[in-house]
């Protein structure tokens, strides 16, 4: 019983997609090739994608969800953070990627 409860707790703290996991308590992104502890904005961006896999998310939605409305963040800020995450996903040999959907936004997909 204790093991079952412990496993339930671990599952609620981790989002998985493909071979990649995001721990919502430690901000750790992991896959078979290793792991990274993400910075706050990287974590929030990755969390948005992990909660909405295969959904096209416009950069305006990323901005609204993660940055303060009074901040000076723009679309190029989102692009920068997505580029950081893409590099980290590649480095840990994740089988998922953040794809650009030209004119629409970004989506988290399993690599083909």
Question: Where is each model-derived feature located?
Answer:
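Positively charged, aromatic-enriched patches within helix-turn-helix-type DNA-binding elements
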Residues: 28-97, 102-104
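Intrinsically disordered, low-complexity protein-interaction/activation regions
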Residues: 37, 108-112
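N-terminal hydrophobic or amphipathic segments with adjacent small-residue motifs
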Residues: 13, 21, 97-99
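Basic, amphipathic DNA-recognition helix from helix-turn-helix-like DNA-binding domains
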Residues: 1-16
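Short, ordered coil/turn segments that flank beta-strands lining enzyme active or ligand-binding pockets
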Residues: 25
